[in-house]
């Protein structure tokens, strides 16, 4: 009898929050009798961790599943497993349309992945495990960080209790629930012990952290406790809803040296009629005042936001207001999404749906405007000094190192190309910025 471990490969789609879920499953499997591989061709078991937030994400998930189903026919793979938001939302349809899939697992059953695979050995039929989405990771579970060792995402809460009219997340992930403070700190210490220099805090809305816990510890309290961990250099804040940003949080970002002077601030729109239809809690004056206050208190802060164009009822006037705001507010980074009409949401039933053609036109105009803004913002950094974490060699040439400044989040922002000086992967060095493009920087190591 062979004692060889079965090999498992994971494909994780969607946002960093999904990636952490995938890492939880990999950690559970690695702790059991499975070997993890990044090569699907040599895997006995392939898991696709899916996203279904918007139409494009759903299509990417389906395309990936079908592609891997073909590989299952041709290769050594014996089990194809689909996990995450897509089966949580569409279990009946998927089971009917994708007979190639052996197991579907929803967002509440990640820790049971090893037991689920074991159960399949005695049950030849297609299996579905779609329970209530109430899972919350804690430090007693093993998580296999798939990012480079020097950086990690740290999920501080699960779910969402906001009721944005376009969003399906609450139905897929459940109500907002914070992890206990000590649980978050214990995982952070473990990540740092494993080599992490940078920790990126994530949740559906990090500003809500702690309000549901005994004693209601604030996000500021969590940040200060994290900053006390020896060996941790950077703390980055992602997904901070504007209505939850307090003066205390602004002062913590300003005064705590380990906190990156960077804030991801998803505003979605600026026109009050659209914000109201979206069921967002912020208004145009409040958003404008917040951006001004952040820039006044922390002049060197890098601000990122995300916007939706083509929301039902968005008029030309609404869009012009948004376009002018993007030009005025001068966000350093900006992501734009065309509104996706998601069944089961209030927005899907609203009148005055905007055509796909108009959505694409508005998307292009907004991205063109932001390219000009980003170019201008980056030019201002020439001849300044930036801290940069070194990530390896450029894809174009091994003569050029690359990295990210504290103003650039992993995966979603630009890079810094290093033209002079030597450093190791994971080092944090000081660079003098010598040139820039729309989204990237170029510099030389000075220390």
UniProtKB/Swiss-Prot annotation:
Q: Which SUPFAM superfamilies match?
A: Radical SAM enzymes
Q: Does the keyword Metal-binding apply?
A: yes
**Top-level EC class, please?**
transferase
User: Where does the TRAM domain start and stop, copy by copy?
Assistant: 379-447
- EC number assigned by the record: 2.8.4.4
CDD domains, A to Z = Radical_SAM
Keywords tagged on the record? 4Fe-4S, Cytoplasm, Iron, Iron-sulfur, Metal-binding, S-adenosyl-L-methionine, Transferase
Q: Which domain of life, per UniProt?
A: Bacteria
- Kindly list the positions annotated as binding [4Fe-4S] cluster 1: 15, 51, 85
**What does the entry give for GO biological process?**
tRNA modification
**What NCBIfam families does the entry give?**
30S ribosomal protein S12 methylthiotransferase RimO (TIGR01125), MiaB/RimO family radical SAM methylthiotransferase (TIGR00089)
Q: Which family does it belong to?
A: Belongs to the methylthiotransferase family. RimO subfamily.
Q: What is this protein called?
A: Ribosomal protein uS12 methylthiotransferase RimO
| The organism of origin for this protein | Geobacter sulfurreducens (strain ATCC 51573 / DSM 12127 / PCA)
Gene (name only):
rimO
